[in-house]
Amino acid sequence: MSISGLLLSVALLPSVVSAHDHVYFDPPSSGSPFLGPQIPLTGPPALTGTHEFTLRHIYQRGTRDQPDLHRRLDIKPHTRLWAVSDDGLEKELVTFDTPLVASSSPLTIQRLADRRLSVIEGYLAAARSSGEAVALSPSEWVMDTLAGPNVTDKESVLTFAKMTANDYIEEPGTEDWHYIHGRFNYSSSFGWQSDGLRGHIYADKTNSTIVISLKGTSPALFDGAGTTTNDKINDNLFFSCCCGQGGSYLWRQVCDCQQSAFTANLTCIVEAMNDENRYYRAAIDLYSNVTDMYPDANVWMTGHSLGGAMSSLLGLTFGLPVVTFEAVPEALPAARLGLPSPPGHDPRLPQSRQYTGAYHFGHTADPVYMGTCNGVGSICTWGGYAMESACHTGQMCVYDTVEDKGWRVALSTHRIRAVISDVLEVYEDLPPCAPEEECYDCELWKFFKSNGSESTTTSTTTTTTAPTTTRTSTCKTPGWWGCLDESTTTTTITSTTTTTTTSTSTCKTPGWFGCKDPTTTTEATPAPSVTTTIPTPTTYPTSSTSTCKDPGWFGCRDPSSTTASITSSPSTTSTCDDPGFFWGCYDESTTATHPITPGPSAPYSTPSPTNKHTCTSSIFFGLICVGSTGTELR
């Protein structure tokens, strides 16, 4: 065809359009010599169908040790992969013999109309600066019905569970990493088992639907095995009330935001969660790179344990369908990150949201999934994990293995391979799914917001006014529990009213535990003084003299003679010839009274009759005498 003929044919076209526009020609008219190309109409994708997925890429996003690392491994037909066991010790060569098939069904999600990364980052930055989620108008939200995973089909649910169980590494010596950003000279010893967030990317045959499976928490409980150290930091940061503080001393502390008992700085916690070396920021970066490779694909999220929680947070952020298994309750970090919430929903309670498109499968014997792995004797606590969150967003699909199978609550039931073989494959029917609305996290805690510049040190000044008591006493007659003499006590209390209280008492009848006399109290204020005069009682001196020649267990067994000299008082003289076994005298007593002058001293006293008794018969080991003879001496 000549150039003139080509130009003529172009001129006869109805219109000229760009190459990427959809063009639909009208039926050719009878007078047109050319038949226009028939371009098929591209309508909306089908909401139902069957998808066969294959592993396409493996992503690694560095976090703690290498925060700037982001690399991708493309899976090719000749790529040799090893499957890593749950404990990270056993490896076996992978053969993809069984296809991963899942079906789709219509799913309604309420999400943002503009979900570009730059827009989402603006909302998150505003939430970090203000301390709360951005309030958006209803016009910025849409209700989209799209093709989502069919959570009522058992085979589809099993497929997603197997995706979360697969943990692959390339056979050593055959690595072929593509570095998205970061340095290109990482040593071969820096494998992805040492640091970072790992994601496995599956795509169907038409690349219209992709699944991002995020790697979950390493099962090792103590530091040094795989990514367990980094996983523990993120677990305690996202799912603890205050970064592992305020609980068991075994919990690993990952921030310093606690101010006092059950009181914490929420701004401090949120800043730590949004650091670039945390899993949530790494998950956003990983998701943005995957969507750059598949811009028109429908994205589904899945994950197990910590990976399931991160998948759910991404789903809430970008409005994606999510299927998780034994996921850590993630409503607490969703509220703290300030994720946008539709009108009519409290952003502080994301578990009350509807139409999230998230489904969390788990069973009642898993303490991590049920939010109970935080007791003093739990394995999580002994391993240093502070798993205090208890609420999930979206729908919970719970297998009651405790009631149905009699299982005990144990951390060993948390492993995804055990969940697949002992739960998902055993139960004939899938459990019903329902939201968990009546659930609250960290109810004992109080959180406050700040501008981020406050010091974490607090000081408290307490002023106390105490009374001062002055006591002066001289004891002449001490008793068992105090002095039996008269006492004078003066108490002065100093207060802001400068009131002085003085109490004076004189005891005439002392008792064992205090004075039995009535108490008289005189309060003195700035007024004319009052003088009170108390007469001094008369003291009678008493003298007693004794000499013991025959001491006993509890006293003297000698005949005793006591002479008391008191003016105008009687005197008594006694001599005991027959003392008792413990106390007392069996002799007859004689009393002499001298009404005018004291009686004569002992040498001039008149001798009294003396009786002597001899016991001839006794009972009760000699304590009682029943027969005696007596001789009277004069």
Swiss-Prot record:
Membrane topology of this protein: Single-pass type II membrane protein
Compartments reported by the entry: Endosome, Multivesicular body membrane; Prevacuolar compartment membrane
Keyword presence, DNA-binding: no
Pfam families for the chain: Lipase_3 (PF01764)
EC category name: hydrolase
Enzyme Commission designation: 3.1.1.3
Segments crossing the lipid bilayer: 5-25
GO MF entries: phospholipase activity; triacylglycerol lipase activity
Any one GO cellular component localisation term in the record: vacuolar lumen
CDD domains attached to this UniProt entry: Lipase_3
Topology Cytoplasmic: residue spans: 1-4
Lumenal side: 26-634
Signal peptide: none
Catalytic activity as recorded in UniProt: a triacylglycerol + H2O = a diacylglycerol + a fatty acid + H(+)
Active site per the UniProt annotation: 305 (charge relay system)
Keyword field contains Transmembrane: yes
Subunit structure, as described in the record: Binds to both phosphatidylinositol (PI) and phosphatidylinositol 3,5-bisphosphate (PIP2).
Function: Lipase which is essential for lysis of subvacuolar cytoplasm to vacuole targeted bodies and intravacuolar autophagic bodies. Involved in the lysis of intravacuolar multivesicular body (MVB) vesicles. The intravacuolar membrane disintegration by atg15 is critical to life span extension.
Protein name: Putative lipase atg15
Organism listed in the record: Neosartorya fischeri (strain ATCC 1020 / DSM 3700 / CBS 544.65 / FGSC A1164 / JCM 1740 / NRRL 181 / WB 181) (Aspergillus fischerianus)
UniProt lineage: Eukaryota, Fungi, Dikarya, Ascomycota, Pezizomycotina
Gene name for this UniProt entry: atg15
